[in-house]
Amino acid sequence: METSVSRVTVSLTLLVLIICSADAMNYLAFPRMGRARPGYLAFPRMGRSQMKTETGTDCCGLGMKSEFVIGQEGKEELRHGACSSSVACCAGLREIVDQKQDGVFFSMCVPDFVASRSSEESSSEVLSKLKSLLQK
């Protein structure tokens, strides 16, 4: 009887180990799939600069460039968006500076349209949409 109990114990232990290793394989074998699955702990990507754009060029792409905030104590803070404020916008984009309703100044790179009547209308539409997104 003692032999069969140890066989059952060994069998159950192996079964638990196989199940645990099958679940752990998803966590350990594919660390970059972490954002696709909820509750998954992914390893950080090493060796990538957060200041560069996706294309790897030295210019800012479409979107937020920087924010200038004056805190309650009068402390000034410059927050960088996708790139630093010293880098120019990429070709085909121009930089605009505006102010939110709460007093925060921001700069962003928006498409630079040719100065024709139809493009002026579409340029103002794009600018108003981007401003409405910033106010949310």
Curated annotation (Swiss-Prot):
Entry comment describing in which tissues the protein is expressed: Highly expressed in the buccal ganglion.
Subcellular location, principal: secreted
Gene Ontology process terms (BP): neuropeptide signaling pathway
PTM remark: Contains three disulfide bonds.
Localization annotation: Secreted
GO cellular component terms attached to this protein's record: extracellular region
Propeptide residue interval(s): 49-135
UniProt entry keywords in alphabetical sequence: Amidation, Disulfide bond, Neuropeptide, Secreted, Signal
Signal sequence extent: 1-24
Positions carrying Methionine amide: M33, M46
Function: Involved in the stimulation of contractile activity in the gut, the increase of the amplitude of the heart beat, and enhancement of the contractile response of the radula closer muscle.
Similarity section: Belongs to the SCP family.
Name under which the protein is recorded: Small cardioactive peptides
